[in-house]
Structures are given as structure tokens and as C-alpha cells.
A protein has these predicted regions:
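Cofactor-/ligand-binding subdomain signature composed of acidic, glycine-rich
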Residues: 1-41
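Generic structural signal of hydrophobic/aromatic residues within well-ordered alpha-helices
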Residues: 13, 44, 205-208
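Glycine-rich phosphate/diphosphate-binding loops that line cofactor/substrate pockets in enzymes
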Residues: 41-53
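Glycine-rich phosphate-binding loops that contact phosphosugars or nucleotide phosphates
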Residues: 51-210
């Protein structure tokens, strides 16, 4: 239960909500709208896929990427298997994380990359590996990030991640917040709607943002 008296005491609220979840939840609707717009501007709505992917692979660091994989798996159901590629390495050091495609992954599979950081060299290497195998690669990452520069138009498509409406706050806490989750998930839902794995047309995403 939320102690409503905290809403009039910013310092006490900050102590009680150290992960900034309340602010993240409040900003989630705006980030869904922005993320949906970014997906449209990236050309997601104009894609005409030839069929469904055999499998969907999801990669990215932290709890937000894990949440994205879990939600996509739940929404896709039996339409296609959804597998999260777990990183190896030292979690607090993004440069030390590595991701490897399963041996069976190939041209009929879809790799989704979700990162609120975008500085992980291991994700760029994963995208390159997937490109060589013939996988379709779509990523959501910050606009100015090494991952976007390495992948977009070279090894796949990158949709810019929707930033927090009033600028980023504590990166360590915001990366696990609801706003970040929706910023990463929304463009991927738009994509999966186009390939027929989930039902998430633009008007439905707008309804989600309005709730």
C-alpha cells in the first residue's frame, strides 16, 4: 500500500521509493507513445514479412531485457518459441558481457535485442554473428549508442529507445523501472504484430498508453 502522505513529502518519497518505480510508472504512458512513434518512423509499420519466424531469440542486459523476453513469450504463446539468450561474464561490467547464438539459429529465425544502455560490445558482436547466419536482427537501443552505430543499416534495424519525458534520472535504477520496460517492449510488439506473432496494432498500443 502507498502511504499517500509521501506524495507531499518529496524527500521521504525518495527514501521510500529508492528505485524510482513510482515516477517510472507515471511516465510509462508517455514512453509507450514515443516508442510507438519511433517504431513507425523506423518503418516497422511498412514491413511486409513473407511469413512468421521459426523462433524468436531475445538478448539484452538486466531485468528489463528479461522482462521483455518473458512478456513476448507469454504473448506469443504457441505461435513461435521465444528464447532468451543469457549473457556470460561479469554483470556490472557491460563490456565483459557476451551473448552467443544457439547452434541451430539461422535464416528463418528472428533476433531481438533490447538494451537501455547500448554500449555493450557483446551485443554488437551478437548482431554480427546473427547477420552472418542469416537471422533477421531488430534492436531497440538509445539513439546515441555504439550499438546503434554498429548495427543500424549494417547488420539489422535499430529503433531508437524512447527516453524518459523529463530526461534520464539515475541510470542504475531507471534501467529496471516500468518506463524502461515499456520503452524497450513497445517497438518490438509493433514488429511482432507485423510478423503475425502477437496482436498489437497501433491503436491498441495507444490504448495501453492511455491507461
Amino acid at each position: 500500500m502507498l502511504d499517500e502522505s509521501l506524495l507531499d513529502a518529496p524527500e521521504a518519497l525518495a527514501r521510500a521509493d529508492r528505485r524510482d518505480l513510482l515516477r517510472g510508472a507515471a511516465e510509462a504512458g508517455a514512453r509507450v507513445r514515443t516508442a510507438a512513434r519511433h517504431a513507425a518512423e523506423a518503418g516497422i509499420g511498412g514491413l511486409n514479412p513473407e511469413g512468421r519466424p521459426r523462433a524468436v531469440l531475445v538478448a539484452g542486459p538486466g531485468t528489463a531485457a528479461s522482462g521483455v523476453a518473458d512478456l513476448i513469450g507469454a504473448l506469443a504463446g504457441a505461435a513461435a518459441p521465444v528464447t532468451r539468450i543469457h549473457p556470460t561474464g561479469v554483470a556490472p561490467a557491460p563490456g565483459a558481457l557476451h551473448w552467443t547464438l544457439p547452434g541451430w539459429a539461422g535464416s528463418v529465425d528472428l533476433l531481438l535485442i533490447a538494451t537501455a544502455d547500448g554500449s555493450e560490445p557483446g551485443l554488437a558482436l551478437l548482431a554480427e554473428q546473427a547477420y552472418r547466419r542469416g537471422c533477421t536482427v531488430v534492436a531497440v537501443a538509445p539513439t546515441r549508442s555504439p550499438l546503434r552505430e554498429a548495427v543500424d543499416g549494417v547488420h539489422g534495424l535499430v529503433v531508437p529507445m524512447a527516453a524518459a519525458p523529463h530526461g534520464e534520472y539515475d541510470a542504475e535504477t531507471s534501467a529496471a523501472g516500468p518506463g524502461t520496460l515499456w520503452a524497450l517492449l513497445t517497438p518490438l510488439l509493433a514488429l511482432l504484430d507485423r510478423v503475425g506473432l502477437v496482436t498489437a496494432p497501433a491503436e491498441e498500443l495507444q490504448k495501453v498508453a492511455d491507461r
